[in-house]
Amino acid sequence: MVNVIGLGYIGLPTALMMASHGVEVIGTDYNKELVATLNAGKTTFKEDGLDELFDAAVKAGIKFSTEYQRTDMYIVSVPTPYDKFSKKVDACYVVAAVKEVMKVCRKGAIVVIESTVSPGTIDRFVRPAIEEVGFVIGEDINLVHAPERTTPGNMVYELIHNNRTIGADDRVIGERVKEYYTSFCQGEIVVTSIRSAEMTKVVENTFRAVNIAFANELARICRHDNMDVYEIIKICNMHPRVNILQPGPGVGGHCI
């Protein structure tokens, strides 16, 4: 049985996807009203295909609770807010969730961190939190990082079709987790180290941010010099190795 911790924009679709594809799932969230809404048969946000996925998961037996479950696999999908003053990701919710897992988990349980974190976050914050209570990583508990790669508005489709990265200390554990994601993911799933998985997510987002910034900077220059940026981009994109984005409002979304 998989206990998905955090039933927000990533955790809920992930839980529903696994449940509707044959995995026994219990979703956990501290928000009592959210859990009550889900148990009443209603979704908590709108997303293309989510209602149909929810119905399929309910028929398959998914359950929702405010309690952490005693099991051997957890998926942590809680917020990692950005501190605008320190310009760092706050991992406190991830650490708190892992600490709660350790109170109930079976020996050898797998804890998958899906939350977006910066490179080194698991080493700096999650591992010490586990070791502080006397758990031995690799024996009492196994750590895995499987960063999500979805975008709001197309989440259900991308959960199925996007490629995935799974980072693990032990490749055997990584392959075991891969089997769960393979239940619904039709994309390629690559198993690597935890730090590499952390880095790939940040690099992917940075690549997008840089390209968005480039298009917007180009628009600013063209506006200053009274040139048509859209015509220039169209001509430049005729080159087989050039693909400039269209100018827009800038970067956005939780991950970027």
Task: Enumerate the predicted regions with their spans.
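Structural/interface elements that position substrates and couple domains in central-metabolism enzymes
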Residues: 1-256
